[in-house]
Amino acid sequence: MSRKQLALLEPTLVRQALLDAVKKLSPMVQWRNPVMFIVWVGSLLTTLLAIAMAGGALTGSATFTAAVSIWLWFTVLFANFAEAMAEGRSKAQANSLKGVKKTAFARKLRAPQHDATVDHVPAEDLRKGDVVLVEAGDIIPCDGEVIEGGASVDESAITGESAPVIRESGGDFASVTGGTRILSDWLVIRCSVNPGETFLDRMIAMVEGAQRRKTPNEIALTILLIALTLVFLLATATIWPFSAWSGNAVSVTVLVALLVCLIPTTIGGLLSAIGVAGMSRMLGANVIATSGRAVEAAGDVDVLLLDKTGTITLGNRQASAFLPARGVEERTLADAAQLSSLADETPEGRSIVVLAKQRFNLRERDLQSLHATFVPFTAQTRMSGINIDQRMIRKGSVDAIRRHVEANGGHFPADVDKQVEEVARQGATPLVVAEGEKVLGIISLKDIVKGGIKERFAQLRKMGIKTVMITGDNRLTAAAIAAEAGVDDFLAEATPEAKLALIRQYQSEGRLVAMTGDGTNDAPALAQADVAVAMNSGTQAAKEAGNMVDLDSNPTKLIEVVHIGKQMLMTRGSLTTFSIANDVAKYFAIIPAAFAAVYPQLAMLNVMGLHSPSSAILSAVIFNALIIVFLIPLALKGVSYRPLSASAMLRRNLWIYGLGGLLVPFIGIKAIDLLLTLSGLV
């Protein structure tokens, strides 16, 4: 993946974010964040008081009130800046995608075939169902499905990956994306969307996040922050009459400063930025999430359904041996296996043809001259083959061939069953070959488990995440590979229906399930899963069913998606802990200063030894504003993440962000108080 990464504090983004922070001072924007809206109202009130004091309309220190007002406005501006920086990063990423969109003309075909009459029309005039022809050098004008032809396609503008990919009619590699370029040959494409609905348009809309909806956890935390704010607002409002009754009324400026320091402004100011940054980090991993809800769900996942091929194993199974049934020559088995694989373009199919050629010098034959009919593999039949004259050759899984043979009046030999078990015990995949009602033998396919995958699964297990391997292999093969890879469970001989049933079973137990998929047959399971990562190379149906799209089409990315989701949740939790701990420490600065005249006994709480009530209040307000600035990089980048158990993670965060949140204000407020005192500003 070669997409350009943005610096954490890109200068151009910082400049734009500063302007946006000022624009966000509008009350129409501020009211969306109740905590910061209270600060905004307090800033406005103290500003009016400072003006009135300066004009002589009110008694009091105009200088002190103005200083408090300025830093309250800075508090609002810094919170706005944090959100604007996160949004700016997303918009910059969206702008890079907008550069992919180009105004172009399309060759619209009057009939769905290569040699049909062509009309040249603007690409934006194409509608769902229109058929277009694209040739080498052309930009694909719309999202669609290839209905004829095959071509090499450069998708680097979308995926960031420079290596071209093959797109062809039929199968799971027929989906194309508008904005990509044809490098060779030609394609006939049926458009699957209307203008403005393309994958690229949806990517841009998702990345810009202008209408980003709050996630459930974010809403719950916002409600908690509002509740705390209301409690402190009521508490502060009741203080004035008590102090007035005692004869030493606390000024409105001090009460506003007290309220702002009591309410959780730190997390209140950073909450939106954390959510936007989470989606931005997901894009940094070349994964497009449809919403923050999807990213958050990834952090809560506790079951991962992982495809064996390409995720757990290297995915390039190769034919390693022909094992004939009793009474069958190995050459006869090899000949039938090669015939059944002549039109099979999968790596496994090509390896069978090559092995037959190497062992017995069997050459490929022309299917057209043989008047043969190829029978393609489907997820339902789980076998493929060829019909030549009176010969009906099939290869496939053990159960599929068993049903096929018995349906044709034959029986499955016991010696082949034993061979199947032996091959499976060795971790290889047995493919059974049959001609008509007769079983000819087995093809042994070997795959290799990826290095380091067992350790990654052990880390996931520590975090309380269950890993389940999904494979079309039989149970013995699946069990051998599962044991070697270290997964917790497996689903063998998987069908789309079995995957869907498994997801529903886990969800009925209260678990959150994540999975990947790329084919149309994966769409029902993707739609059911809580986190569904569709491969960009997959079909349109799969991409529409998922709530994330992996531009690299790498099934292993699911583990990284979960890590990013957990990092977002950890960042939010850590900064919430830090914010609340911060507030506790600030009480020791501002409460003695605010009420020392009313209740002299509160002076014993001035454990920091702050110079004066004015310097204490101003120091607390300044610290309250500056801490938001210092935490912006952490909110954008996320806290450091380690794969630990929930209890270990909680202990670690309480030590770092809980204790840190208590200590930092003591140091920071005392340092600011010393600077104010030494400079003579108070």
Curated annotation (Swiss-Prot):
EC number(s) recorded for this UniProt protein: 7.2.2.6
Molecular function via GO: ATP binding; ATP hydrolysis activity; magnesium ion binding; P-type potassium transmembrane transporter activity
Name of the top EC class for this enzyme: translocase
PROSITE patterns for the chain: ATPASE_E1_E2
Catalytic activity: K(+)(out) + ATP + H2O = K(+)(in) + ADP + phosphate + H(+)
KW Electron transport (keyword) present: no
HAMAP family tied to this protein: KdpB
Subcellular localization(s) per the UniProt record: Cell inner membrane
Lineage of the species this protein comes from: Bacteria, Pseudomonadati, Pseudomonadota, Gammaproteobacteria, Enterobacterales
Designated name of the protein: Potassium-transporting ATPase ATP-binding subunit
CDD domains: P-type_ATPase_K
TM spans (from-to): 35-55, 62-82, 219-239, 254-274, 588-608, 616-636, 656-676
Keywords of the record: ATP-binding, Cell inner membrane, Cell membrane, Ion transport, Magnesium, Membrane, Metal-binding, Nucleotide-binding, Phosphoprotein, Potassium, Potassium transport, Translocase, Transmembrane, Transmembrane helix, Transport
NCBIfam families found in the cross-reference section: ATPase_P-type (TIGR01494), kdpB (TIGR01497)
